[in-house]
């Protein structure tokens, strides 16, 4: 993907070079016009911005087109994300890459790898739009790895975010799952079961139901051990 981006940039700057040459020849034959030069510089700047914006928009659409694979074929999703984003140096793109790869690793059950991807990022530099997915997947991975204190620290440290997340169409199911894990990790099985049944009813989407299937086994085992 980076190669195509470079090609677009090269073509743009070739056009700019030709235009600059033509403008230089014109101004050499006529009276020097500062206004024309200033206008040309503005055109160059705005053109460069437009090229970047169009490329990133195209890239975003291609990433979005891979989304169905995240649930059905996470390995293919990972390959697609790496093909699109793996060689792009932009910090924002690499943040998106790591967050998306971590989500795919969670789908595969490779939670240690998900943690590796997420902890490689500086959370202070992650845009607000990605904060929910970042912290939710990190908490989920920590819970699955048995690192309950670290998982709860993630949730407690971002309490306002997780409260808002409960009503999110995209992340509400995951937030509900995490609330069950949280109660279970604190030893409150009664509350955990209560939240579990509420999540079953409120979030019928396949992804949440799949996670709740796993969680049910955990709760049943904990309940049996307590008897």
What label would you give each PLM region?
Residues 1-16:
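Juxtamembrane interface helix immediately N-terminal to a transmembrane segment
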Residues 56, 91-94, 128-131, 168-171:
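Residue signature of alpha-solenoid helical repeat architecture, marking inter-repeat boundaries
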Residues 17-18, 188-227:
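Terminal, low-structured helical/coil segments at or just beyond the last alpha-helical repeat
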Residues 108, 145, 182-186:
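Structural motif corresponding to the intra-repeat A-B loop/turn of tetratricopeptide repeats
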Residues 82-86, 115-124, 156-166, 197-202:
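Amphipathic alpha-helical segments of tetratricopeptide repeats
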Residues 64, 96-103, 130, 136-140, ...:
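"A position-specific structural signal for the A-helix of alpha-solenoid helical repeats
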Residues 39-69:
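Transmembrane alpha-helices and immediately adjacent membrane-cytoplasm interface residues
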Residues 35-40, 66-82, 106-118, 146-157:
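Helix-turn-helix repeat elements of alpha-solenoid scaffolds
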């Amino acid at each position: 993907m980076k190669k195509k981006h470079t090609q677009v940039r090269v073509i743009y700057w070739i056009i700019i070079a030709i235009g600059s040459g033509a403008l230089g020849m014109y101004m050499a034959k006529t009276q020097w016009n500062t206004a024309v030069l200033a206008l040309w510089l503005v055109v160059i700047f705005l053109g460069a911005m437009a090229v970047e914006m169009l490329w990133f928009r195209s890239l975003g659409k291609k990433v979005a087109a891979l989304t169905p694979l995240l649930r059905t074929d996470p390995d293919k999703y990972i390959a697609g994300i790496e093909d699109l984003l793996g060689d792009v140096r932009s910090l924002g793109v690499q943040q998106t890459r790591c967050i998306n790869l971590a989500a795919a690793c969670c789908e595969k059950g490779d939670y240690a790898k998900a943690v590796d991807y997420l902890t490689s990022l500086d959370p202070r530099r992650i845009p607000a739009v990605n904060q929910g997915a970042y912290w939710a997947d990190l908490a989920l991975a920590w819970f699955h790895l048995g690192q309950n204190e670290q998982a709860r620290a993630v949730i407690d440290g971002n309490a306002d975010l997780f409260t808002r997340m409960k009503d999110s169409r995209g992340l509400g199911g995951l937030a509900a799952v995490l609330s069950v894990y949280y109660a279970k990790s604190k030893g409150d099985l009664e509350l955990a079961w209560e939240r579990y049944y509420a999540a079953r009813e409120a979030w019928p989407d396949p992804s949440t139901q799949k996670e709740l299937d796993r969680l049910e086994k955990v709760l049943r085992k904990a309940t049996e051990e307590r008897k």
